Amino acid sequence: MTKVGLRIDVDTLRGTREGVPRLLATLHRHGVQASFFFSVGPDNMGRHLWRLIKPRFLWKMLRSNAASLYGWDILLAGTAWPGKNIGNANAGIIRETATYHETGLHAWDHHAWQTHSGHWSIRQLEEDIARGITALEAIIGKPVTCSAAAGWRADGRVVRAKEPFNLRYNSDCRGTTLFRPLLMPGQTGTPQIPVTLPTWDEVIGPAVQAQSFNTWIISRMLQDKGTPVYTIHAEVEGIVHQPLFEDLLVRARDAGITFCPLGELLPASPESLPLGQIVRGHIPGREGWLGCQQAASAS
């Protein structure tokens, strides 16, 4: 049996309102639990449109057929009008999710984090994280114990900024296996659970066709030599590609794969995890930098 952590990112108002309820129903039908990470502040995702001037981002949007994949309401959110508050508008859906699944913070403002966090000060990072955690805790009525950086935009500064919040784990980077981030010699931070597998929008195109994606990703899960963690998005697998995701759950079960919340991947003693660090890097299929796992020594 292969255990795979299932991470569900919720970036937008529509993803929360339409995608999450469908995912909850789908997961319930198949007896699967996952980790949901919510954006709870304003939905300004449409402001990413300026990135179309960047060739890699434009190619990604064309390759994934973004207009039909996400819908124009997502692609234009927060452009000509102020972005609506996601958490306030969908508190009931978020509370229901937290009743049945592990629930953590993705971002206060997904667009702001993905666009600006790379040059924010530690204080600005802490204030933004605090704003998101406070809002999410007010919605679900219990402490937030985990987080996942929006767009995997994380580095050593983000690791340090999250330390005051005493989270059980963070999932802020791409990598191969769980690790303890080294803050300074002799001091480690909150365990990191990296995403190890590509997302739909990173690979769909000439190399992998939509109709063969499930076969391809299951093969990758079975071949993963680390701790497999897979990310889906409420805006994609919860809406237009919900049937494809349901088919994935069936095929994965038949292949001996069990999906679980990320928290279930943590060992009883996190001190046993190897040391590592998060550095800025790049991966195929994704525009811009993102946090990547790198080995570190204790000295």
Curated annotation (Swiss-Prot):
Its EC number is 3.5.1.n3. Keywords: Antibiotic resistance, Hydrolase, Lipid A biosynthesis, Lipid biosynthesis, Lipid metabolism, Lipopolysaccharide biosynthesis. The keyword GTP-binding does not apply. It catalyses: 4-deoxy-4-formamido-alpha-L-arabinopyranosyl di-trans,octa-cis-undecaprenyl phosphate + H2O = 4-amino-4-deoxy-alpha-L-arabinopyranosyl di-trans,octa-cis-undecaprenyl phosphate + formate. Pfam families: Polysacc_deac_1 (PF01522). Pathway: Glycolipid biosynthesis; 4-amino-4-deoxy-alpha-L-arabinose undecaprenyl phosphate biosynthesis; 4-amino-4-deoxy-alpha-L-arabinose undecaprenyl phosphate from UDP-4-deoxy-4-formamido-beta-L-arabinose and undecaprenyl phosphate: step 2/2; Bacterial outer membrane biogenesis; lipopolysaccharide biosynthesis. One of its GO terms (molecular function) is hydrolase activity, acting on carbon-nitrogen (but not peptide) bonds, in linear amides. GO terms for biological process: 4-amino-4-deoxy-alpha-L-arabinopyranosyl undecaprenyl phosphate biosynthetic process; lipid A biosynthetic process; lipopolysaccharide biosynthetic process; response to antibiotic. One of its GO terms (cellular component) is membrane. The keyword Hydrolase applies. Residues 2-260 form the NodB homology domain. InterPro entries: ArnD (IPR023557), Glyco_hydro/deAcase_b/a-brl (IPR011330), NODB_dom (IPR002509), Polysacc_deacetylase_ArnD (IPR050248). Belongs to the polysaccharide deacetylase family. ArnD deformylase subfamily. Catalyzes the deformylation of 4-deoxy-4-formamido-L-arabinose-phosphoundecaprenol to 4-amino-4-deoxy-L-arabinose-phosphoundecaprenol. The modified arabinose is attached to lipid A and is required for resistance to polymyxin and cationic antimicrobial peptides. NCBIfam families: PRK15394.1. This is Probable 4-deoxy-4-formamido-L-arabinose-phosphoundecaprenol deformylase ArnD. It comes from Salmonella paratyphi B (strain ATCC BAA-1250 / SPB7). The gene is arnD.
